[in-house]
Each structure stands twice: as structure tokens, then as C-alpha cells.
Amino acid sequence: MEKSYSESYAAAGVDITAGYRSVELMKQYVARTMNEHCIGGLGGFGGLFELDCTGYKHPVLISGTDGVGTKLKVAMIMDKHDTIGIDCVAMCVNDVICAGAKPLVFLDYIACGRNVPEKIANIVKGVAEGCVQADCALVGGETAEHPGMMPEDEYDLAGFTVGVVDKEKILSNETMAAGDVILALPSTGVHSNGFSLVRKVFNIDADPDVLFSTPAELGGKTLGEALLAPTKIYVKPVLKVLEEVQVKGISHITGGGFYENIPRSLKKDCCARINKADVRTPALFHLMQKVGGISEHDMFNTFNMGVGMVLTVPAEQADKALEILHANGEPEAYRLGVIAEGEGVELC
């Protein structure tokens, strides 16, 4: 059967053939994420995945959805679209592992003013790379043209993931107590939160060329390159730790920084006590604080400050947890603080 084509629809701004071309170009990337649990191919009405319950007494599915926010604006100005998909996957899978779950499948949604097949395929290339890093399958997606609603050269990107965890292994902070140790897993940079403030600080909307500047603090990188560093995906090292260590809490440090996200994994009447001098903050954050005149409190209440994820473990297992992290892709993981009596986050 010939591919359908509607001259009337194309005249209204939706090119069906561009959609077909996008799918053909992205197939090679999607194929990298497929595994023995995937049933059927690309193009069906739904993504099929055969759940293997071997090893699970009572499997529980956990889902998460997120987007990349206005980091997309930086990608559009830089005309670099092949890593922003990693951010999309990271924002979703890093959330579900906070419950101790292994991500299984991922789906993406792209809305655009005009479907440029090469650009769409590049975006999906990044999504597929993120799925490979997270060891989950890209089983479906949607690309929607929105003529008249979005400028032709703009797009939005969001994703959705489903993971699985044994019910008895869902992370609980019930045994969290004073003396437990908080471990930091470093970020690659700003990740995917706080970009509305980043854009304001550097006046990016009015002066997009600033993204091509090379501030001395960034060691030869352009500002745009530093800001587009993909969000780190912590799935594999964290799952390794969960196999051998009693993890009492995990927080993905996203919008709201330390003050909003660390308390989400704390037991009532427990406080995260962190010495600010122990936080290994990259130069990019110091540059933003200086240029924007941002208070230290607002920095820690907006950005990850170089810490993308924190794990709370018993003091006697902290060294073992670090050893596992160091051997599984997190060589720079370190002790960040301790649990004390109280509530919230205490930065001293």
C-alpha cells in the first residue's frame, strides 16, 4: 500500500511524509534499545513489553513522567539536538529509581512547529542513548506538528517511563536515624532544572550570542556547551548499590535544589546536616551566582550545586556503598553529610 499523502493537510502545515521520513531515520537509534522483552516493531498503536517476573515475589510497577523545560531554548539557539533526549530520559528514570525501581520502558513525546525529519531523528537519537544508559527499551513515541501554535523552528520534549520493584524492596525511610550517612553522586552541571533563571542571569533571550562565549571559569568550553551537558543517568550504579547495601533513602536533586528535594526522602524528625564546604560545586555555579548576584540560599534552593542524587545509608555500610559506586561509573561519589535529629536540610 502506498504511503498516504494529503495536499490539503500539507497546505495547512502538517506534512505526513515528513513524519514517515522521521520514523525511517530514527529506526536505527530505537533499535539500540530493544531487548528480548520487546514484542513487535516500531509503528504499532502501542508498545508491547513482556514483563519477566522471575525473581520478583510481588512486582510493583512505578511510573514517572517529565520534560526538559527551557533547557530546550539553549539547544535551539545552539542548534544542537542530539543530547537533549538524554536529559528527557534522565529526568524520568532518575525519579523512579528513588523508589528502588528498575526502569523497563520509555516513551517520548515531541511537539514541534514543523517536522524537520533530521532534527526529529537527532532528538530521538539522544532519547535512545538515554535509554541505553538506563537499560530500558524505547517502545513508543509521538511526534506532533502544531502549525499556528508553535513557531516552525521550536519544539517541546517530554517522556514517560515505567519501572518495576519488588513490593518488599520499595525504599522506605522507616529505619532512618541520626548517624546515617548521606552520599553524593556528582552532577554533570545544571542538568535540566533552573533554566528560566539561567536564561535571565546570562540575558540569553535578548543576547543569544552569549552562549558562544568562553568564560575563563569554564576551562575553554563555551557557555552553551557547559549548559547543555546532559543530565547524568544514575540507574546502573544505584541499582548495584541496592543489591548489596541497605539504602534508606534516595533523592533526585532537581528543581528546588537541596532544600526541596532532600527532605522528600527523609523520615519525619530527621534532618540532613551538610557542611557547605564539603559540597563539591563546579565553576559553572559560581559563575552563575556571581553574574546574577544570587544569594547562596537561592542557589541551593534552585540548583543541584554539583550534586545530582543523594543516597542515605547506615554509617557502617557507607564505605561499601562508595566502593560499589566507584566501581560502577561513579568514581567521584563522596560523603556529603549525616542524618541528625530535626527536620529539613541544615547547611552549615
Q: Where are each of the predicted segments found?
A:
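N-terminal amphipathic/basic leader segments beginning at the initiator methionine
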Residues: 2-37
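Short, acidic (Asp/Glu-rich) active-site segment that either coordinates a divalent metal cofactor
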Residues: 156, 169-222
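Glycine-rich phosphate/pyrophosphate-binding loop regions near the starts of catalytic domains
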Residues: 28-188
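Short loop/turn motifs at secondary-structure junctions
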Residues: 100-102, 197, 246, 332
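Hydrophobic face of alpha-helices
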Residues: 23, 121-124, 195
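Residue-level signature of catalytic and energy-coupling elements of molecular machines
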Residues: 15, 66, 179, 252, ...
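Buried hydrophobic packing segments
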Residues: 22, 26, 48, 92-93, ...
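Glycine-/charge-enriched secondary-structure boundary and capping motifs
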Residues: 2-12, 119-134, 150-157, 207-211, ...
